[in-house]
């Protein structure tokens, strides 16, 4: 009897453990699948290719400007701001995944030099926290603290994103030196046109996969179209699927060519990348420079005083 109870208890514990594991997996997967920029993080070990191109451009095909502002120099173990600017016309609306029109979102990736990282909350000043707002930054990889990502966030509120950055200290990190370092940034506004698997989103142009005559255009119940094309080369019917939210440029009976646009281009966003330079300055060098400048100023003052004294002596000799 006791053995049976023991086995029953073990079975219940195993069942409970499996249930908890499944719940954790489902919750984790749901959060990952909706996270951004999960596409880049899942498919690329490093967001910046050897050519210098940031991989976000593989999905966001339109080229748009982006800018970054950082201090020229920073001291070790200090917190500074890296401000990423993603400008666009706030009146623009984009096609959402459900086919409706909505506001644009923005996102950014900041690639810092090795050793630089996101500043801990207790090192961020109240003024800087006010600029940051409710933004939540994350590392591109757990072992890549120098690469930060953010988004998607509402573009109307966060077209300027302030990253709080902690500068490294060469005294405690021997891999860091007092040098000039590059900083790279990529920023997008709006949805992408291509998914990582190569399929298109509904935020891009759809072209004809065959040349011929459009025999039928079927409007689907949940939105979108099925366009039937009679191929001019062999008479076979080819069906092109158009997702919801796109505006057709063709009509039934129209003769079209291969790769001719079937829809207008709905994309109003785009991706851009830029760079900046920052100098990790040695405090002793700054102190030495200040001492030198102070010495020069004092020398000039003494020269002026000496000159005035000499002029007084000359004047007194002339009067004598």
Curated annotation (Swiss-Prot):
Cellular localization per UniProt: Plastid, Chloroplast thylakoid membrane
Domain of life: Eukaryota
Quaternary structure annotation from Swiss-Prot or TrEMBL: The 4 large subunits of the cytochrome b6-f complex are cytochrome b6, subunit IV (17 kDa polypeptide, petD), cytochrome f and the Rieske protein, while the 4 small subunits are PetG, PetL, PetM and PetN. The complex functions as a dimer.
Family named by the database record: Belongs to the cytochrome f family.
Segments traversing the membrane: 286-305
MF annotations from Gene Ontology: electron transfer activity; heme binding; iron ion binding; mRNA binding
Signal peptide bounds: 1-35
The protein's name in its UniProt record: Cytochrome f
Membrane topology note: Single-pass membrane protein
Keywords: Chloroplast, Electron transport, Heme, Iron, Membrane, Metal-binding, Photosynthesis, Plastid, Signal, Thylakoid, Transmembrane, Transmembrane helix, Transport
Keyword hit for Chaperone: no
Cofactor(s), by name: heme
CC cofactor note: Binds 1 heme group covalently.
Record: residues binding heme: 36, 56, 59-60
Function of the protein: Component of the cytochrome b6-f complex, which mediates electron transfer between photosystem II (PSII) and photosystem I (PSI), cyclic electron flow around PSI, and state transitions.
Annotated gene: petA
Biological process annotations from GO: photosynthetic electron transport chain
């Amino acid at each position: 009897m006791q053995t049976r109870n023991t086995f029953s208890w073990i079975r219940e514990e195993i069942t409970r453990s499996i249930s908890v594991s499944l719940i954790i997996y489902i919750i984790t997967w749901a959060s990952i699948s909706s996270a951004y920029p999960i596409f880049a993080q899942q498919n690329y070990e490093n967001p910046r290719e050897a050519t210098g191109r940031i991989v976000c451009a593989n999905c966001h095909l339109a080229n748009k400007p982006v800018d970054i502002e950082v201090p020229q120099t920073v001291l070790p173990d200090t917190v500074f701001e890296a401000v990423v600017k993603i400008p666009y016309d706030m009146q623009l609306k984009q096609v959402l995944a459900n086919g409706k029109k909505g506001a644009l979102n923005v996102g950014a990736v900041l690639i810092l030099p090795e050793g630089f990282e996101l500043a801990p909350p207790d090192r961020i000043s109240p003024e800087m926290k006010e600029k940051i707002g409710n933004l939540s930054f994350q590392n591109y990889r757990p072992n890549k603290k120098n690469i930060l990502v953010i988004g998607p966030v509402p573009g109307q509120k966060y077209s300027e994103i302030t990253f709080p950055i902690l500068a490294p200290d060469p005294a405690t990190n021997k891999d860091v030196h007092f040098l000039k370092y590059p900083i790279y940034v990529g920023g997008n506004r709006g949805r992408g046109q291509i998914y990582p698997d190569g399929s298109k989103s509904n935020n891009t142009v759809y072209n004809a996969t065959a040349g011929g005559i459009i025999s039928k255009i079927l409007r689907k119940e949940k939105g979108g179209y099925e366009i039937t094309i009679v191929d001019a080369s062999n008479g076979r019917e080819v069906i092109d699927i158009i997702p919801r939210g796109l505006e057709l440029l063709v009509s039934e009976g129209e003769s079209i060519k291969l790769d001719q646009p079937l829809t207008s281009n709905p994309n109003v966003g785009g991706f851009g990348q830029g760079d900046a330079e920052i100098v990790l300055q040695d405090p002793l060098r700054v102190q030495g420079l200040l001492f030198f400048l102070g010495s020069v100023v004092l020398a000039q003052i003494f020269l002026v005083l000496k000159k005035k004294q000499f002029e007084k002596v000359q004047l007194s000799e002339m009067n004598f």
